[in-house]
Amino acid sequence: RESIKREGGHRSNVIERIMVGVSSNASDTGQLLRKASRIAGQLNAEWFAVHIETPSESVKNIGTRDFVALLDNINVASDLGAETVWLKSDDVVKALIDFAHDKGVSKVIVGRTHQPRWRRWLKGDVVARLVADATDLDVEIVATEEREDSR
């Protein structure tokens, strides 16, 4: 958002920038992207949809269905007004944080992980690590599943 900050009596324009991570294996990424788009709209912010391709999730290692879903999500992000970015890295969290710093991102939006606990323990929990390591960024974890009516 364009806001005015007073620093020593001077006024300066600050543009809010938001980043959302796009995974190749998340079935609810489309919903996450729509939420990020709404948040960016409310803040009048620029936003980025960033996919980090790791060696284990390279194009040749993920299934056709996951790859098509990833491309669909990248297209959805672009249609919603995001600048889409595809990076390669061994370390998803470090790549996201480095990108955020390079682009002046102040808020990172991620979806709550739905991986089984054993998989998070074995492979590491990207969301938890992002919260722990991105101490200078606001990290917002959003629910991406529809809540059932509890009547």
Please report, for each region that a protein language model flagged, where it lies by residue.
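Structured cytosolic domains appended to multi-pass membrane proteins
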Residues: 1-150
